[in-house]
Amino acid sequence: MKKLLLGDEAIAQGALDAGLSGVYAYPGTPSTEITEYIQQSPLAKERGVHSRWSTNEKTAMEAALGMSYMGKRALVCMKHVGLNVCADPFVNSAMTGTNGGIIVLVADDPSMHSSQDEQDSRFYGKFAMIPTLEPSNQQEAYDMMAEAYDMSEKLQLPVLMRVTTRMAHSRAVVQCADAPRQQNELNYNAKASNWVLLPAFARKRNDIVTAQQPLLEQMAVDSKYNQYIDGKNQQMGVIASGIAYNYLMECFPNGCPFPVLKISQYPIPKKLIRRMTDDCEFVLIAEEGQPFIEDQVRGVMPGNAVIKGRLTGELPRTGELNPDLIKKALGMEIGENYAPCEDVAPRPPALCQGCGHRDVYQALNEVLLNYPNARVFGDIGCYTLGFLPPYKAIHSCVDMGASITMAKGASDAGQWPAVAIIGDSTFTHSGMTGLLDAVNENADITVIISDNLTTAMTGGQDSAGTNKFEAICRGLGVSEEHLKVVVPLPKNMAEIKETIEQEINYHGVSVIIPRRECMQTLQRHLKQKKAAEKK
């Protein structure tokens, strides 16, 4: 059966057809569509596949470990910075091993289209000593899922699959299986000595995983996804990984004249690389992200070949690749006999018309006119756009949950007033522990939890704390007297400003919750309601 699928959708369909029992994820571009596809899949509903959003990536990874412990196949999805959040269980999952297969799907974002950095997740796979896959097209993304699950169960290791933005968000026709594999049965074969990571047991597992590394490398050498393609002109060779291989092939519609080593499975296949460095005078390494392969080739490969790539300037050190960049690196002429597209009028990002965050920033800015030394610590979400004109309201945005802890640290340093602004989903993701720290030390900060009843930035997914924030804050020790809820509307501006003024001047932890539904989800709900009424 053929389907036209996004890269993310091909991954999701591949997981379902491979006998998936549960997907665990926190939404983050460019990975969000994987979980959404599974949530909407008739096959997933028929089979009872667990597909709910997790509070954060760490809880997602740990839940997947629990499913694997019981012998079922699990998928964990996140964007690249989410892998930092779940690094503890991710790395330790190599020590526990797997019972049912686990695939950790990480979507990297070269050029930082919607992220605060462009870190390369392949380093995590190497660090954790587990197999890593990087599809070069949507068909490979689909096919790799079944093979990755088999690999995970055979090796008793999780498998990391890395995709990038262009792979995740481009479409292609994918040949899918006619019939999906059956889901694993529940089993109790997990050995307690593997899963209880006391030092005595963990040392043994560490030795086992270390001893597996030559096998993983040989599997990469033998993998059908790592191909050595001979070329007539051996002056230059090209090593291309993931989607960069597609860009290379686009440069040569009639076939590349140089030897090409396509890499889509790691650890790097040293035998194949050695063949190229022995045969070729120059080797260009084309890879999305950091010079992961290039660093290793320079460090461990013998041979006389001159290595070129991101570290030598033939390719840009940062940002995405494209066919023109690869042509230039190969010394080819870049065609200019085409009419360029007309410049698109600039459309800077902005908070939506009618968004409750706008009213919050308007009130906050007006109050802080009386406090010229005030500092507002922001967080990750739609409200980060409050940094831009016309509000220019926040002074920092580092990572999920940092607003509260940075405000506390600034207060510890003597800053007043110190205000944190954080969204509802980000608060439950990683803000609660920071608030607990602040309460325990009676920090002099004001926390604004801007609650729009959804995870708006990534498309309106459910927020774990909806209708629970007052109870959560009370449970963390916030005083009832200094826990306020307001409705961010222009007509309520006087009340909102008065509340902010009062809580800033309270010397302790205070929390303000401006609550109003996201305009985008509100419009969607109204459309759904009208459609239902017509039936």
Model-predicted regions and their roles:
Residues 34-37, 63-65, 86-90, 112-119, ...:
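Short acidic, glycine/serine/threonine-rich loops at helix termini
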